[in-house]
């Protein structure tokens, strides 16, 4: 998903780039992120622009991920590059087994695990959740969202106001 891109993604992509002359990144859709995480933090075009502007990324491809896999994207890559190139589907520290990976069935693709490191060093979800769960600091004090009723457009906030201060 690369939503948002973090140090673990960078390590994965740099290590994957060392395996080949070209790095093609398959970028999941906003719909996939909504199914997996509730909603995207950054939309597809924002994520694509970030990735396309990394010196080690040669191409960013969209694909049909409605089956929650990258099979369609890998099939696109095979059509673009086979038979002249060795093709790798690289997985970082959070995927390390053929048992739970539908992409293993794509002909012409070699699977690589632990690329960029054998352990997961960061998480997009963790970064986003930590950012939004911190109290917002202001000159007058701070506030925190205790409950978000997004469907109603309502947030319940706690305000802590410093003595002698008032909100703006």
What do the predicted segments below correspond to?
Residues 129-166:
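A short, N-terminal "cap"/entry segment at the start of jelly-roll beta-barrel domains
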């Amino acid at each position: 998903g690369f939503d948002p891109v973090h140090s673990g993604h960078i390590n994965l992509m740099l290590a994957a780039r060392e395996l080949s002359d070209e790095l093609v990144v398959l970028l999941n859709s906003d719909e996939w992120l909504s199914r997996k995480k509730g909603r995207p933090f950054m939309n597809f075009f924002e994520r694509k622009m970030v990735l396309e502007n990394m010196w080690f990324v040669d191409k960013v491809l969209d694909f049909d991920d409605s089956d929650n896999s990258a099979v369609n994207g890998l099939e696109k890559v095979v059509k673009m590059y086979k038979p002249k190139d060795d093709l790798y589907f690289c997985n970082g520290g959070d995927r390390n087994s053929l048992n739970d990976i539908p992409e293993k069935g794509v002909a012409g693709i070699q699977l690589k695990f632990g690329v960029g490191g054998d352990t997961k060093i960061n998480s997009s979800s963790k970064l986003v959740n930590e950012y939004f769960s911190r109290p917002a600091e202001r000159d007058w004090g701070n506030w925190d969202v205790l409950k978000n009723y997004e469907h109603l457009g309502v947030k319940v906030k706690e305000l802590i106001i410093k003595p002698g201060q008032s909100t703006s």
